[in-house]
């Protein structure tokens, strides 16, 4: 469960930092009226993920974009080397970005600024917008809890969506492996139990159930060894019976 726990921890940390950065750098607030509302949130293939929407809105879309990027950079910097090693593959799978551990921050910043400053995003004046994510996995017995932070602008929400695509892609890569690993561990345990049971039955049979040949061997082994002189003494102590030939004739 370690990988799933680390993903959930990263998701929580990222959400907290985004909220904090939006508040500090973009004057965002949960009480500010949002120009854009999230209508529906779709996960095309949902395998154990929960979602909540949180409003942290402001009027400064550019500051929102910078705040989200700052939160993402700090969160990435706090990952372990092992966790960072997974990130480039996540970028390729989720955003079709070819990157490396050393350039991932710069590449993500370039992607977000180029994508979220495009006319398709900036000119989107819809007051109610929908968000669509491909798929998300939760670990067995431990659902992944996601939080989409509505910034109130198309730019800010574009950056938030890019981050969510990355985090959900991470769940699709790690959680299924855990399921497979759990199955392997289960069969390993079953095989181990069968082997131990077979050994127990073998020794129990040897101890509790003795074959006829083994019984004979045990009797002979426990029988007193008699010296040959004992047989001589017995012979001479016992008077032999003499049968006369005349008696036989009669």
UniProtKB/Swiss-Prot annotation:
<keyword id="KW-0945">Host-virus interaction</keyword>
<keyword id="KW-0261">Viral envelope protein</keyword>
<dbReference type="GO" id="GO:0016020">
    <property type="term" value="C:membrane"/>
</dbReference>
<dbReference type="GO" id="GO:0046718">
    <property type="term" value="P:symbiont entry into host cell"/>
</dbReference>
<keyword id="KW-1162">Viral penetration into host cytoplasm</keyword>
<keyword id="KW-0519">Myristate</keyword>
<keyword id="KW-0472">Membrane</keyword>
<dbReference type="GO" id="GO:0019031">
    <property type="term" value="C:viral envelope"/>
</dbReference>
<feature type="lipid moiety-binding region" description="N-myristoyl glycine; by host">
    <location>
        <position position="2"/>
    </location>
</feature>
<protein>
    <recommendedName>
        <fullName>Entry-fusion complex associated protein OPG095</fullName>
    </recommendedName>
</protein>
<comment type="function">
    <text>Component of the entry fusion complex (EFC), which consists of 11 proteins. During cell infection, this complex mediates entry of the virion core into the host cytoplasm by a two-step mechanism consisting of lipid mixing of the viral and cellular membranes and subsequent pore formation.</text>
</comment>
<feature type="topological domain" description="Intravirion">
    <location>
        <begin position="205"/>
        <end position="250"/>
    </location>
</feature>
<feature type="disulfide bond" description="by OPG088">
    <location>
        <begin position="49"/>
        <end position="136"/>
    </location>
</feature>
<dbReference type="GO" id="GO:0055036">
    <property type="term" value="C:virion membrane"/>
</dbReference>
<keyword id="KW-1015">Disulfide bond</keyword>
<comment type="similarity">
    <text>Belongs to the orthopoxvirus OPG095 family.</text>
</comment>
<dbReference type="Pfam" id="PF02442">
    <property type="entry name" value="L1R_F9L"/>
</dbReference>
<keyword id="KW-0426">Late protein</keyword>
<feature type="disulfide bond" description="by OPG088">
    <location>
        <begin position="34"/>
        <end position="57"/>
    </location>
</feature>
<keyword id="KW-1161">Viral attachment to host cell</keyword>
<keyword id="KW-1133">Transmembrane helix</keyword>
<keyword id="KW-1160">Virus entry into host cell</keyword>
<dbReference type="GO" id="GO:0019062">
    <property type="term" value="P:virion attachment to host cell"/>
</dbReference>
<feature type="transmembrane region" description="Helical">
    <location>
        <begin position="184"/>
        <end position="204"/>
    </location>
</feature>
<keyword id="KW-0946">Virion</keyword>
<keyword id="KW-0449">Lipoprotein</keyword>
<comment type="subunit">
    <text>Component of the entry fusion complex (EFC) composed of OPG053, OPG076, OPG086, OPG094, OPG095, OPG099, OPG107, OPG143, OPG104, OPG147 and OPG155. Except for OPG095 and OPG053, each of the EFC proteins is required for assembly or stability of the complex.</text>
</comment>
<dbReference type="InterPro" id="IPR003472">
    <property type="entry name" value="Virion_mem_poxvirus_L1"/>
</dbReference>
<feature type="disulfide bond" description="by OPG088">
    <location>
        <begin position="116"/>
        <end position="158"/>
    </location>
</feature>
<feature type="topological domain" description="Virion surface">
    <location>
        <begin position="2"/>
        <end position="183"/>
    </location>
</feature>
<feature type="region of interest" description="Targeting to MV membrane">
    <location>
        <begin position="2"/>
        <end position="12"/>
    </location>
</feature>
<keyword id="KW-0812">Transmembrane</keyword>
């Amino acid at each position: 469960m370690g990988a799933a726990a680390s993903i959930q921890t990263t998701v929580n940390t990222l959400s907290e930092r985004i909220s904090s950065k939006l508040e500090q750098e973009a004057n965002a607030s949960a009480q500010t009226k949002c120009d854009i509302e999230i209508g529906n949130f779709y996960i095309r293939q949902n395998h154990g993920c929960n979602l909540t929407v949180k409003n942290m809105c402001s009027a400064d879309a550019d500051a929102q974009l910078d705040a989200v990027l700052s939160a993402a950079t700090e969160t990435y910097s706090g990952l372990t080397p092992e966790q960072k090693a997974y990130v480039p593959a996540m970028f390729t799978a989720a955003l079709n970005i070819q990157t490396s551990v050393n350039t991932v921050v710069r590449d993500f910043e370039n992607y977000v600024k180029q994508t979220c400053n495009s006319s398709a995003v900036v000119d989107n004046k819809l007051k109610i917008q929908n968000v669509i994510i491909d798929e998300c996995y939760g670990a067995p017995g431990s659902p992944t809890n996601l939080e989409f932070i509505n910034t109130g602008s198309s730019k800010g929400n574009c950056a938030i969506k890019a981050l969510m695509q990355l985090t959900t892609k991470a769940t699709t890569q790690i959680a299924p492996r855990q399921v497979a690993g759990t199955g392997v561990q289960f069969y390993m345990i079953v095989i181990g139990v069968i082997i131990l049971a077979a050994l127990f039955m073998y020794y129990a049979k040897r101890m509790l159930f003795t074959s006829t040949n083994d019984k004979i061997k045990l009797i002979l082994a426990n029988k007193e060894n008699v010296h040959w002189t004992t047989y001589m003494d017995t012979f001479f102590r016992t008077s032999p019976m003499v049968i006369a030939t005349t008696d036989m004739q009669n």
